[in-house]
């Protein structure tokens, strides 16, 4: 890596500086529309956003600027060509092209192309944003040819991370400058009309929970796992004292923010970064013995503290709660004239209606086809005789239903389970229908699942989401369903499964696993190319850092970048790619390869 003494700021670096330091901080309340409202499991198509919209707009703009720069500036094209014609560097661009190309084709062939291109509900990470990620990676990889230029990006990251982590640390102490009466007028300035019953901006996570400007506490974990290793390195190694102070303050606030977020994925990601650092420090174990001992003591202390605070952690990871569902009902399937119900005990009930019957006129059959005796009536409550059917109550009521694009009141038979869960059925012109939580009629059908049985509660109910995601993988062996189309591929009409695992009317928009997300949305080749890029970075960093002789700055900062990237990859086992953190990742990913280009 060139040891240039020039410290001037070049214009082409501005997109990198803005993306790494400013974009994660952008928040503003805006309204938007989504085509998701046409689906029976979604309430409507109009939503309010606070964290994602401005980030998306900024990234699309930066991506366009970078592409224009590459097309207009000859010297940039020459630099890119020089990288392409270098044998050891060409493989990076080939892998990146596979990732970007397969992602683009998947998006262009997606069922919901608008979402795939521009971003969808609660994600806003469409193809245009992914194109910006790739452009940022290329800009960093092609053009950061000197140590000082790389330091400009690192220093921008330090300043941005300090601002963000101070906000997060204050939230951990119950002080939230994003959700209070003073800042609300600023954050709502672009709203033409505020939602009804608007009482100011409030955090849905509760007081004392850190989310900073990253939309969700989980993404705080991904951010800290990515940025903390480089921040700590700069706090120790930066040549300028003012940046050492900024880095040290940022590192402390990041740790407080991580604790406030409660993100286990982030904690594990930080632990993985520490492990990678230890692995490389073993290249000179005698010289680094004091550091290794210190890291070991701190690591043991952190693990001991975590286990003391979470004594049932390993039991819950290995066994879950041992309950595949929390409801009396395991599944329901309807066909227009009947509903087949499977109870948690294994018993089966079939509710059957005649073609011309009202919704209140039904009979119940057991698994052998014999009628089950009933007591009471529909208006006072019907119960089935037998201990196996305890906790089930059928009642007559009326409910407003969205049917044929109009809201109308219909007679409804309500099945209440254990005085907690209710399931409404109505007889419409098309036959018997289940009325879901958003007041729309739908059918109940078999939902394919794989694995995690008895562990649906694993990792905050990720076990359930993964069990419904695994069957989707086989349809994405070549191409995926398209960026931000996961919500449409996932069985969001798995009403029983979602209620049993506490999701109720929530729309599952992501698999809570970055690798499953890429596979399903972009296709298996895109995932393999993405993983190959990391393995290439890991291998080249090993070759660089395990050379004999005194460690130089290039080797040390290569290790810092690798630790951060590794932490992000590990956190991705339980977190998704998010527009709040991914721009920082792709830039640091590109910078990490740029540092290695001299090899």
Locate predicted features.
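Interfacial/capping segments of alpha-helical transmembrane domains
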Residues: 31-43, 177-190, 480, 490
């Amino acid at each position: 890596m060139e040891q240039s003494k020039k410290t001037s700021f070049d214009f082409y670096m501005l997109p990198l500086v803005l993306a790494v330091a400013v974009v994660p901080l952008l928040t503003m309340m805006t309204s938007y529309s989504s085509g998701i409202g046409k689906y029976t499991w979604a309430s409507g198509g109009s939503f309010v956003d606070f964290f994602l919209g401005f980030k998306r707009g900024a990234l699309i703009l930066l991506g366009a600027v970078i592409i224009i720069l590459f097309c207009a500036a000859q010297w940039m094209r020459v630099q890119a060509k020089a990288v392409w014609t270098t044998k050891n560097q060409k493989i990076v661009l080939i892998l990146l092209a596979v990732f970007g190309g397969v992602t683009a084709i998947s998006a262009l062939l997606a069922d919901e192309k608008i979402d795939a291109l521009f971003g969808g509900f609660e994600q806003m990470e469409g193809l245009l944003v992914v194109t910006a990620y790739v452009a940022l990676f290329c800009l960093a990889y092609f053009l950061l040819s000197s140590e000082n230029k790389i330091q400009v990006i690192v220093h921008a990251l330090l300043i941005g991370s300090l601002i963000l982590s101070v906000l997060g640390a204050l939230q951990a102490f119950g002080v939230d400058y994003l959700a209070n009466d003073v800042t609300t007028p600023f954050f709502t300035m672009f709203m033409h009309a505020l939602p009804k019953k608007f009482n100011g901006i409030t955090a849905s996570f509760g007081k004392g929970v850190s989310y900073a400007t990253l939309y969700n506490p989980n993404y705080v974990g991904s951010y800290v796992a990515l940025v903390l290793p480089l921040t700590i390195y700069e706090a120790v190694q930066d040549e300028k004292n003012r940046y050492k102070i900024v880095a040290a303050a940022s590192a402390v606030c990041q740790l407080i923010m991580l604790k406030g977020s409660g993100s286990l994925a982030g904690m594990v990601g930080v632990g993985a970064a520490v492990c990678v650092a230890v692995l490389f420090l073993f290249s000179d174990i005698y010289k680094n013995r004091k550091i290794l001992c210190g890291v070991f003591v701190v690591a043991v202390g952190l693990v001991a503290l975590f286990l003391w605070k979470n004594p049932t952690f390993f039991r819950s990871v290995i066994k879950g709660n041992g309950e595949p569902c929390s409801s009396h009902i395991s599944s329901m399937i309807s066909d227009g004239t009947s509903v087949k119900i499977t109870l948690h005990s294994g018993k089966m009930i079939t509710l059957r209606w005649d073609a011309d019957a009202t919704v209140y006129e039904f009979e119940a059959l057991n698994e052998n086809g014999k009628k089950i005796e009933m007591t009471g009536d529909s208006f006072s409550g019907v119960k089935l005789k037998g201990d196996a059917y305890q906790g089930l109550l059928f009642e007559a009521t009326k409910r407003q239903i969205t049917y044929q694009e109009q809201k109308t009141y219909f007679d409804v038979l309500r099945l209440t389970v254990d005085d907690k869960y209710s399931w409404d059925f109505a007889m419409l012109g098309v036959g018997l229908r289940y009325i879901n939580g958003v007041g729309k009629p739908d059918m109940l059908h078999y939902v394919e699942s794989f694995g995690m049985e008895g562990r649906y509660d694993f990792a905050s109910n990720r076990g359930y989401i993964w069990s419904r995601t695994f069957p989707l993988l086989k349809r994405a062996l070549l191409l995926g369903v398209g960026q931000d189309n996961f919500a449409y591929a996932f069985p969001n009409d798995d009403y029983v499964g979602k209620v049993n695992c506490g999701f109720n009317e929530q729309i599952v928009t992501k698999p809570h696993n970055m690798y499953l997300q890429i596979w399903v949305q972009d296709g298996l080749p895109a995932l393999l190319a993405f993983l190959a890029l990391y393995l290439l970075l890991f291998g080249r960093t090993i070759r660089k850092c395990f050379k004999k002789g005194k460690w130089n700055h290039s080797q040390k900062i290569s290790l810092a970048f690798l630790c951060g990237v590794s932490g992000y990859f590990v956190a991705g086992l339980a977190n998704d790619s998010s527009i709040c953190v991914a721009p920082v990742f792709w830039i640091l990913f590109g910078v990490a390869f740029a540092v290695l280009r001299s090899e």
